Amino acid sequence: MLNNLYRHWLSSYIGIPKSIWFLTAINLVNRCGSMVIAFITIYLTQQLHFDIREAGYVMVFFGAGALVGAYAGGRMTDRLGYYPVQFWSLVLNGIMLLILMLVHQFWTMCAAIFALSLISEIFRPANSVAIARFSTPETRTRSISLYRMSVNLGWTVAPVFGGLLASLGWDWLFWVDGLTCIFAALLLRGLMSPKAAAPSTTDTDRKAALAETVSPYRDRTFLWFIFLTMLNAVVFMQLMWTVPVFWKEGFQWTEARIGLVAALNGFLVFLVEMPMIHRLDGKRHQLQYVRFGLVLYAVAYLAFELPIGQALSAVLFIVAISFGEMFVMPFSSNYVFGRSAGVRQGQYMGLYTMAYSVANILAPLFGTQIIAAWGYAALWYMLIGLAGITWIGFWILGNNNPDGVRVQTPPERTADAIPQAG
């Protein structure tokens, strides 16, 4: 039995294009270096002696920068191509991190954090377009899952190394993070050919193609999908913003115990998502899986109100929210990939990224204000209700647009048509 499970787990990785593995490796290096953001609030309050309100305002600028960066990244990707946008985003992000350690004043820090977030977020739409271009329809969802594995693994590693570096001195954190970004850019240059990724259309052809394809900002079905995606992200992101505070204040847990339980999320996603996606992909509509994931989100928050004890409720929460994430995120990304193509693909990816950027601003505000006014129990029930409303929205969307496809323009390159460097 274990041998069969192992073979199925291994088979889920077979057939994924080599370029997707390269992109995953580049993203893993980049994510492993995402140490400054993991510790930025502590750095602002402990090292720069900002009060908690000032630190909160700085993070609002971070969210605003991410929103602008996602929009700009989508536009730039369609105009310049995904390769230069990724490369220069990584390089400039590394330089910006080195500059950031020289900033100590509040308003200067707000501007620097805005710029850092903007530059960093420009990378995401370009990276998503690259994954879409290199993967085939048969491997697309698994390619997304493989990419997400690198994100989860990187976010697991980054806080560990970040904590060690911060204990040696905060400058170490900025230097290593900045140089890691630049190294990821060099890795991109070494593994993948910039010539192969260049746009294949002339300006005249591009203008003609733009006239023939639908802008995502006029695609009402897609805008409805983006709104629902933002709502489900607000539900999910309480995992990062309010649940750890609840474990600290409500359960009186130590940071070590909170970190250990939270790490179970990344471990489950790393272990289970790829083989699960391999078994499920193509058997049902993507939005059916997304709706099931939302049911699991609701179960996760309900766990805190069940009379089953602290440890069991926390484990049930993590298991449910992790499996919910595995159903929601890969299949919603695949829905976007299937709906977008050609000269506007970057804009579609940028708008999808913006949904999470907006949620990243709204989620902590929504969660903390509900807690302050009515307490944690009220928040859990409101999140369950929000998950239910979002489920209904996706049900309506799926019934009105069962195929999920609007734009039929073929991509500029196929997975097999793009050679690697060297």
Show where each model-derived region lies:
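Cytoplasmic helix-loop-helix junction between adjacent transmembrane helices
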Residues: 114-151
